[in-house]
Amino acid sequence: GLGNTAFYTTDAANLATPYYNTPQGPQRMHEGLRVALPEEMAGGEVLFSPARALNAEAYPSGGAGMVGDADDVLQLVEALRSGGQGILQPDTVALLRSPHVGAQAQTQGPGWGFGFGGALLVDAEAAQTPQHVGTLTWGGVYGHSWFFDPQAQLSVVILTNTAFEGMCGRYPQQIRDAVYAALQG
């Protein structure tokens, strides 16, 4: 099971110190911090609450409120890539991995559509990515990103503690490119 993943933890030692990007470099995040989303994400801002990770009464937000470790996240991503593995029914996984909104969604830029599970690659050439059509990806505002590529039989989890770089900055792209370069030999 996913023994280290929940919507809160009782042990602050389980948490990394959160940071956010600034032109001067990463800055330590504080309670109530408002940070503008990158322009490519249609603007707006995020109100951060690092303390929510220690609050069992906080709203259980899957987009900005889960805590967990790399092993658990990889186990979940692998289950999605390989058809459910007893965590989800295969029909549910098929829905998560199907394009419900086409490339017009462009949540990750050109070439990306959207399924129930996140951004779904519908045109690798337009996206300028080494990933294959059918790759599913998503991330979280506190600085994580993950993707799986069913054709390459590959799952990748990137856990950082820096918003928004770890979610949608150059770092996840550099990791992606390094992984695919290594696969090419």
Where are these regions (language model features)?
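Short, small/polar residue-rich loop motifs at catalytic or cofactor-binding pockets
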Residues: 140-142
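Short, surface-exposed loop or secondary-structure junction motifs
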Residues: 1-130
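Short, well-ordered beta-strand elements
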Residues: 146, 153-161
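Short, surface-exposed charged micro-motifs
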Residues: 117, 145-147
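Generic C-terminus detector
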Residues: 163-184
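Short, hydrophobic/aromatic-rich segments at coil-to-beta transitions
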Residues: 130-136
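Well-ordered beta-strand positions
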Residues: 137, 147-149
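Short acidic-glycine loop/turn motifs at beta-strand connectors
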Residues: 11, 150-152
